[in-house]
């Protein structure tokens, strides 16, 4: 973590501009942090390695926690452990957080799961007719969430890109408009198509090439050596599992990741958070 960035901004100036104490964004970040702590503690209890991913690894390295303008947490588990973790979370529910997948929410058609907060709501301010908003409002649970992504080796990148496009089409073109068709399409991909892709990967894929599992909407290709075994990383003053080589993972995804992006590239999600 550094104090003064390439733009001349400091950690403190970023905090005051984007997520000062008491702001809605900071409250959301702290709620997400509590959810991530619970998720990792639960995973450890059942022996499932579960680590921070994506922008949260970047945030830990550059800011010691959240990227100041960020409002989400991503965690990943090995594909072979994914169902076991999800099944446990559904069988042993938290009083405030719920595991969201297609079993618990018939309007959720993604190939990953979410841990959702029941005492908040994300309200989209996208255009009412937009596909993103329809997809969001088709879901039963809409609170703050921690994404739980499966990842695996033996991936074939072009098949993953095809899988992602198929899944995106189900979510953006069918969700909220044609729920029965969306459910049929989701099940066809989940039960038939993506397992066939996985079998092809087992036969012809590179065991040292790791990606998010088939159907996730991400395409980063990472060598096995920077993914596993997990190593501890400090995030918002708490110790989480992180990737084996956080520096290499960030360089693959973001290049010179210790530099701040220009202001117009600091992505803020089009969501308002309401606490109940």
Enumerate the predicted regions with their spans:
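Conserved catalytic core of two-metal-ion nucleotidyltransferases
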Residues: 9-12, 17-44, 89-155, 182-186, ...
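Conserved oxyanion/phosphate-binding beta-strand-loop segments in alpha/beta enzyme cores
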Residues: 2-7
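Active-site nucleotide-donor binding segment shared across nucleotidyl transfer reactions
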Residues: 40-73, 77, 82
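A short secondary-structure junction signal
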Residues: 157-164
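Short, conserved charged micro-motifs
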Residues: 83-87
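Short, cationic low-complexity segments
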Residues: 167-183
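Short, surface-exposed loop/helix-turn segments at secondary-structure junctions
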Residues: 165-166, 214
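N-terminal beta-rich core of secreted/periplasmic extracellular enzymes
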Residues: 156-157, 170
């Amino acid at each position: 973590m550094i104090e003064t960035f390439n733009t001349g901004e400091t950690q403190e100036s970023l905090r005051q501009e984007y997520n000062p104490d008491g702001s809605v964004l900071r409250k959301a970040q702290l709620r997400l942090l509590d959810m991530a702590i619970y998720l990792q503690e639960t995973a450890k209890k059942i022996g499932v390695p579960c680590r921070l991913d994506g922008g949260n690894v970047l945030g830990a390295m550059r800011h010691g926690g959240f990227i100041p303008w960020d409002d989400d947490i991503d965690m990943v588990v090995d594909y072979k452990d994914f169902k076991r973790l999800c099944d446990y979370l559904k069988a042993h529910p938290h009083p405030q957080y719920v595991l969201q997948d297609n079993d618990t929410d018939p309007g959720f058609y993604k190939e990953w799961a979410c841990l959702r907060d029941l005492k908040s709501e994300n309200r989209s301010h996208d255009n009412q007719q937009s596909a993103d908003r329809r997809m969001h409002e088709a879901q039963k649970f809409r609170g703050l969430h921690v994404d739980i992504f499966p990842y695996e080796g033996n991936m074939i990148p072009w098949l993953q890109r095809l899988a992602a496009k198929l899944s995106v089409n189900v979510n953006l073109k069918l969700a909220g408009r044609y729920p029965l068709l969306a459910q049929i399409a989701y099940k066809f991909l989940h039960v038939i198509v993506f397992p066939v892709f996985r079998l092809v990967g087992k036969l012809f894929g590179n065991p040292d090439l790791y990606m998010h599992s088939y159907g996730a909407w991400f395409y980063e290709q990472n060598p096995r050596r920077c993914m596993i075994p997990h190593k501890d990383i400090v995030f918002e003053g708490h110790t989480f599992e992180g990737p084996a080589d956080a520096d290499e993972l960030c360089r693959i995804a973001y290049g010179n990741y210790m530099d701040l992006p220009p202001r117009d590239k600091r992505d803020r999600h089009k969501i308002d958070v309401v606490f109940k």
